[in-house]
Amino acid sequence: MWKRWLALSLVTIALVHGEEEPRSKSKICANVFCGAGRECAVTEKGEPTCLCIEQCKPHKRPVCGSNGKTYLNHCELHRDACLTGSKIQVDYDGHCKEKKSASPSASPVVCYQANRDELRRRLIQWLEAEIIPDGWFSKGSNYSEILDKYFKSFDNGDSHLDSSEFLKFVEQNETAINITTYADQENNKLLRSLCVDALIELSDENADWKLSFQEFLKCLNPSFNPPEKKCALEDETYADGAETEVDCNRCVCSCGHWVCTAMTCDGKNQKGVQTHTEEEKTGYVQELQKHQGTAEKTKKVNTKEI
């Protein structure tokens, strides 16, 4: 009788211990409030700390931020504010209304990392839905085989996918291509192409702007976590979405690169009495791009810091 009681006690203790282990984080963070855009995490010492949210849920409920940028949802807005250390509030629900202005300081059309990652998430979701398990008498299709099928369908015979071929592949899925950040449809088409280029850059190991099958496989590998790249300028690093100005032109940090408008500045748009020749302006933009070497060298450090 006592042996039976001892066995039951051991089972009960094991079950209680098993239930407590996964709840340890929730217990530590139970009374911790981190605020919008942040979440509670547990340090190596077992203490609670607040960090920027690692990944927001992908539900689509666009909001316009006070910075004039459209976000997929409230969480993405507050996460961006946390990562950039800036104060961003919800201006109104829905996409930001495009300002019909002739002002040359308007921001260039760019693919932000959030846009790139959202396109990638939708592609992976679509491809995973096509997986067919092996049956009793039939062979199914695994993830690699599905990617191989699409790769061969859009490859022109050189065993690589360039940006136009990759774009044709993306356009096979209505959900994937429906990334709408701008009110103007032409800008959204441009955004789609820019995000395809950003996806190619993720796994283009030899920098030829084409993907071999292995690079294509890495790009859309569900377990691959794209790094968050920053832009460098004058010994400083800037988060995705940061902006700077060159005369009447605006430059935006997008996926680790500075992207600038190309407006011709007249006397009314220039600041103060400063004048710059086209050569000086071109040189400044080249200076922005030159600093990307520094950003690439510190890529791993920056990723860890985030």
Swiss-Prot record:
Signal peptide residue numbers: 1-18
All copies of domain Follistatin-like, residue ranges: 28-51
Any Pfam family the entry gives: Kazal_2
Subcellular location: Secreted
Record-level Gene Ontology MF annotations: calcium ion binding; heparin binding
Positions annotated as glycosylated: 142, 173, 178
Tissue expression remark: During central nervous system development, strongly expressed in the telencephalon, diencephalon, brainstem, limbic system and spinal cord. Widely expressed in all organs.
Annotated SMART domains: FOLN, KAZAL
VWFC domain segment(s): 231-285
Residue numbers bearing the Phosphoserine modification: 163
Disulfide links within the chain: 29-40, 34-50, 52-82, 56-75, 64-96
Observed effect of gene inactivation: Deletion mice die at birth from respiratory distress and show multiple defects in lung development. In addition, skeletal development is strongly impaired.
Predominant place of localization: secreted
BP GO terms, sorted: endothelial cell differentiation; endothelial cell migration; hematopoietic stem cell homeostasis; negative regulation of apoptotic process
Alphabetical UniProt keywords: Disulfide bond, Glycoprotein, Heparin-binding, Phosphoprotein, Repeat, Secreted, Signal
CDD domains according to UniProt: EFh_SPARC_FSTL1 (cd16233), KAZAL_FS (cd00104)
Every EF-hand domain range: 142-176, 191-226
Domain named Kazal-like: residues: 46-98
Function text: Secreted glycoprotein that is involved in various physiological processes, such as angiogenesis, regulation of the immune response, cell proliferation and differentiation. Plays a role in the development of the central nervous system, skeletal system, lungs, and ureter. Promotes endothelial cell survival, migration and differentiation into network structures in an AKT-dependent manner. Also promotes survival of cardiac myocytes. Initiates various signaling cascades by activating different receptors on the cell surface such as DIP2A, TLR4 or BMP receptors.
Description of how the protein assembles with itself and partners: Homodimer. Interacts with SCN10A. Interacts with DIP2A; DIP2A may act as a cell surface receptor for FSTL1. Interacts with BMP4. Interacts with CD14; this interaction promotes TL4-mediated signaling cascade.
Full protein name: Follistatin-related protein 1
Source organism phylogeny: Eukaryota, Metazoa, Chordata, Craniata, Vertebrata
